[in-house]
């Protein structure tokens, strides 16, 4: 994990989960020139009521063909010398910390990058959720666990012989330009997933909380019959 002194206070994560949402956080970042913070719109919550707020543990996936040996020490074997077709995936999973989000990109979306057993391990470790640039599987099992997962949807084909993790706790970038560094804040809800740069997370959360209060005031003005044009002229909120 990134240096704990650099991370957003965990109490602020609770505020994000209970008081904020991706739309307002995205608006606040747009206003500050952070305009590529949403992940691709294909990445959606497994269930509409799932919410994620946690620190990024970025994971880099790569396509492969067949059960090939790893390209880095420890990639090709698991404990006891057993062949490990997943590269560094199991190691990355075991190193998840409390409030971290397993967030993965790099491969092509033709196999599942997440499943029930991974969710079980992550939940046991206190992780905040998983976000994958591809599919998940074992949907019913994940629902029973209640572990937040965001993906392209459900597709049972395994990543074994098709993809492997080649690095983790490293910077990653999604196809739409969104960059994720270790310790960035990942927020996901029914409207999508975004990344808040670690160095500006406290500033962004504070501004978003203020904007939520302003939006509530605007809602009351609209209910009283004021025009949206007039309201926007007074508040700059819409």
Q: What is each residue range found by the language model?
A:
Residues 113-117, 133-134, 142-144, 161-162, ...:
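A short secondary-structure junction signal
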Residues 154-231:
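Acidic, glycine-rich flexible loop/linker segments
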Residues 1-92, 101, 220-226, 233-237:
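Intrinsically disordered, low-complexity regions enriched in acidic/Ser/Thr/Pro/Gln residues
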Residues 91-119, 123-133:
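Extracellular/luminal Protease-associated
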Residues 26, 36-37, 55-58, 100-103, ...:
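Structural motif
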Residues 20-24, 54, 84-87, 91, ...:
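Conserved active-site and cofactor/substrate-binding residues in soluble primary-metabolism enzymes
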């Amino acid at each position: 994990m990134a240096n704990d002194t650099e991370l957003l206070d965990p109490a602020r994560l609770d505020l994000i989960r209970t008081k904020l949402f991706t739309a307002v956080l995205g608006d606040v970042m747009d206003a500050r020139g952070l305009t590529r913070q949403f992940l691709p719109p294909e990445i959606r919550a497994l269930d509409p009521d799932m919410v994620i707020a946690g620190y990024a543990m970025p994971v880099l996936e790569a396509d492969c063909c067949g059960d090939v040996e790893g390209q880095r020490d420890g990639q090709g074997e698991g404990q006891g010398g057993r062949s490990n077709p997943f590269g560094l995936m199991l190691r990355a999973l075991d190193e998840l910390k409390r409030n971290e989000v397993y967030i993965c990109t790099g491969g092509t979306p033709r196999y599942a990058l997440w499943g029930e057993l991974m969710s079980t391990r992550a939940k046991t470790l206190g992780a905040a959720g998983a976000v994958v640039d591809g599919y998940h599987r074992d949907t019913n099992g994940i629902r029973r666990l209640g572990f937040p997962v965001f993906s392209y949807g459900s597709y049972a084909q395994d990543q074994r012989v098709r993809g492997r993790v080649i690095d983790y706790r490293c910077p990653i970038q999604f196809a739409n330009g969104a960059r994720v560094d270790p310790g960035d804040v990942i927020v996901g809800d029914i409207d999508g997933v975004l990344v808040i740069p670690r160095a500006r997370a406290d500033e962004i959360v504070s501004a978003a909380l203020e904007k939520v209060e302003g939006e509530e005031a605007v809602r009351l003005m609209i209910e009283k019959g004021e025009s949206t044009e007039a309201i926007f002229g007074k508040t700059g909120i819409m």
